Each structure stands twice: as structure tokens, then as C-alpha cells.
Amino acid sequence: MTPISQTPGLLAEAMVDLGAIEHNVRVLREHAGHAQLMAVVKADGYGHGATRVAQTALGAGAAELGVATVDEALALRADGITAPVLAWLHPPGIDFGPALLADVQVAVSSLRQLDELLHAVRRTGRTATVTVKVDTGLNRNGVGPAQFPAMLTALRQAMAEDAVRLRGLMSHMVYADKPDDSINDVQAQRFTAFLAQAREQGVRFEVAHLSNSSATMARPDLTFDLVRPGIAVYGLSPVPALGDMGLVPAMTVKCAVALVKSIRAGEGVSYGHTWIAPRDTNLALLPIGYADGVFRSLGGRLEVLINGRRCPGVGRICMDQFMVDLGPGPLDVAEGDEAILFGPGIRGEPTAQDWADLVGTIHYEVVTSPRGRITRTYREAENR
């Protein structure tokens, strides 16, 4: 990797290394074996930028893309993405017409959603490419066992009318980080039972997919025809207890030091003076805060990397700024120097997992949080 450097003119940035995305997709493809790979780019690519991630993932061998909503899929189409895209989370009363006209695949979780989709088929004259999402134990969206026979009947009728192309059967796993938990086996058995029931009723799906990131990496027996990794695409380990699993985190959040100042022992810092300097020391002001995704609960707990060394945050994190302690003595930090809040960790900087551990959350929330005055930038992929 090349050294990180601050982009001129930016207050702060979330730099996304597309080479890391490329690497991660190739690692996932190796684990997927014979199965195809659907890269999940919902929530604007987990905060990394859906379009650029999608382009990179497809170039690295992903066959399809997955998103939560039709609007997310349409945004990819507007940006020129022509690969298969599946959307699976829909509010009541949605107009599926734009999805059909843009060749977006639709996953339905209920007969009501299928009815709404068929209404759009009749209006537009376009055949719908349909996946059925079944509930195997997560108890969110998905067709349950009691409703599945009626769904199969409705699908047979729709196929007889050439209203739908039946593409897939999918479900979602309870555990994102425990590939060996017994509920995974229970879900696989239930999923297989759904497939068998469909075959008995003369309904055949082109593909079946259950595996999330952790199953893709650690449960080859759950592969089926397609794997559907999300967080691992972005280089964050789906099973932190197992280390990085060969993945490379793609996001680095950094900003410029806005101000350097000295204070005396006994002086307080930031709102409420929750930190009192125990000695004469030097401080650096960083010009982003909780409005930009730096969690307020990290106040007095986080560290940042400046000029190769970790500096602790002191005092409360404010809406648009916070302070770090540079320590006493001669200054080795100047205004304009780069401060890395989190990144892959290869330079000694904190990682997204470090932040998650500090505030009792998951790294998913950390990387989807940068916003406001943090500008997303990209490092293009290089030959690795």
C-alpha cells in the first residue's frame, strides 16, 4: 500500500481503497468455490460508496449485486451499472414499475408484495424477475412455512401467465459472527426443506442462497448456488474472534490538525471540563465531531495517529471538533499535519473494530457513520 496523504482542500475524508475491495472480493470468491458471488452494496456500500464498490466488485469477479431497497438499485442503474441487481426490502404500497423498467430483480417476502409486483407487471407489460425470501429463523421479513404453500400456488399461476421469471430462493442467517452456532445448521435444514417443498409442487428456482460473509468464509457446506457477502467485501472480519481472515479494511478516516496550542497543568478542556491537564502539555484540535460520525461516547477514550504515534483524545467530543493530547515538551505536530482516526491498522492507527470495542457496538456501525464534513474519496486499485 502507498502512504496515506491528506487530499488538499478537504477538511476531513473517508478514503476508500478500491484495491482492498478488489482483494477482498477475490478472497471471497476463493472461499465460495463453485458458487457465484453477490456483493451486497446496500446502505451506500456500507458507507463506502455503492457505485464505486459495485464497479470494483464486478471487476474482481462478483456476478451480481444485492441492495435493500429498489431506490438503491435504481441509483446503481442511474450510474450505469448493468449487472444483475436484487432488492429485498419494500414498504407497503410501493410502485414496482420503475424496478421492472430498469430490470431490477425483486425479492418478495409475502403474498401482498407479490400481488403489488404483479400489479406493476400488468401495468408495464414487463416480466418480473422474482426471488422469494423465506424466514428460516431470523424472524424478520420472509415467507414463513405456513404461508409458503400459498406462495407456491401464486407463483405457479404467475409463471403460467408469463408474468414472472422465477429466479431465486433466499434466506438470511441469524448469526453474522458465529459460523459454528447450531442455529446455522437448523436454518440450513429449514432452507433445504423449503426447496424440497417447492420441487414437490413443481416450482424450481434457478439459484438458492443463504450464506452471509461469515458462512462464505467459514461454512462451505452452506454455499448452495450463490453466496451473499456484505461486510467482508469491505475488509472487516465477519468473525472478529478469528482475526482478519485475510481481508483488508478498505476505509481510512482522517483529517488535518486545525490548531495546536499549549495549556498549563490544572486547566480544563472542552465542555464541562471533564478532563483536567495533569501537567503542562500541548493539544491539537481536530475539526470534526459527532455531527460527522465521531461518536460522542468516544470522548476521552479514543486515540488518533499523528506522525506515527498514538495521541489520546481528551475532554468531550463536540458537534464539530475535539481535542487530543500531544504531550509535554517540544512540539512534533504542526497545524495541517494528518490525523488518522481509524484505518486498516497497518501504520499503528486504530481500527474500526477498536472503535466498536470502545463503545460496545459493531464495526458495521462505525464504517457507516462518517458523514457531514467528512468527504468520501477513493484510492484507485493497483496491481497487487
Curated annotation (Swiss-Prot):
Source organism per entry reads Mycobacterium tuberculosis (strain ATCC 25618 / H37Rv)
**CDD domains xrefs:** PLPDE_III_AR
Q: Keywords in alphabetical order, please.
A: Isomerase, Pyridoxal phosphate
GO cellular component terms, A-Z: cytosol
Under which EC number(s) is this enzyme classified? Answer: 5.1.1.1
Q: Write down the Gene3D superfamilies for this protein, in alphabetical order.
A: Alanine racemase (3.20.20.10), Lyase, Ornithine Decarboxylase, Chain A, domain 1 (2.40.37.10)
Q: In which pathway does it act?
A: Amino-acid biosynthesis; D-alanine biosynthesis; D-alanine from L-alanine: step 1/1
GO: which molecular function terms? alanine racemase activity; pyridoxal phosphate binding
Please tell me whether the keyword Isomerase is annotated for this protein: yes
Q: Which gene encodes it?
A: alr
The name under which this protein is listed is: Alanine racemase
